[in-house]
């Protein structure tokens, strides 16, 4: 399970170093293989360990190619999907189209989301945090059926 936000750098060759604490689980459980694709709701990338991605692919396989919305979803997620492997230094290469989609430059954030990571431009991440906090403050959590009994 991946959790926490890590500030990392994108090097001039388009590579990022995965934080050390995540490397061993990625190597042992997923042979260092990761699939990167776009987030269809935010300007960030999603990084799935290979076995998690295979679950997503199984769901995508069941979607219709004749339904416009389903086909569009498949086209974006699969069209941008790129499999990478951790190198000996724990780095992965982010292909240019993916870097462009998420407006990634030098300073980026790798954010654990339990079964996957999000990869954000640092400034976009800070803005996203502000938006999330505003949403939570503006919503009546008790009226949200899935959050009504959620407590910390």
From Swiss-Prot:
Which UniProt keywords are given for this protein, alphabetically ordered? Cytoplasm, DNA-binding, Repeat, Transcription, Transcription regulation
According to the UniProt entry, its GO molecular function terms are: DNA-binding transcription factor activity; transcription cis-regulatory region binding
Q: Mind telling me which SUPFAM superfamilies this protein's record contains?
A: AbrB/MazE/MraZ-like (SSF89447)
GO CC annotations, alphabetized: cytoplasm; nucleoid
Its localization reads: Cytoplasm, Nucleoid
Enumerate the PROSITE patterns for this protein. Answer: SPOVT_ABRB
How is the subunit organization of this protein annotated in UniProt? Forms oligomers.
Q: Which family does it belong to?
A: Belongs to the MraZ family.
Output this protein's name. Transcriptional regulator MraZ
């Amino acid at each position: 399970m991946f959790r926490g936000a890590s500030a990392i750098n994108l090097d001039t060759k388009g590579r990022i170093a995965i934080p050390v604490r995540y490397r061993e689980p990625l190597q042992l459980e997923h042979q260092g293989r990761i699939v990167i694709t776009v987030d269809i709701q935010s300007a960030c990338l999603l990084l799935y360990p290979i076995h998690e991605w295979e679950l997503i692919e199984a769901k995508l396989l069941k979607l219709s190619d004749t339904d416009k919305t389903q086909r569009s979803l498949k086209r974006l997620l699969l069209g941008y999907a790129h499999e990478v492997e951790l190198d000996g230094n724990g780095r992965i290469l982010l292909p240019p189209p993916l870097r462009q989609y998420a407006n990634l430059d030098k300073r980026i954030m790798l954010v654990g989301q339990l079964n996957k990571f999000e990869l954000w431009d640092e400034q976009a991440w800070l803005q996203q945090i502000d938006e999330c906090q505003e949403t939570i403050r503006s919503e009546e959590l008790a009226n949200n059926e899935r959050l009504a009994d959620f407590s910390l």
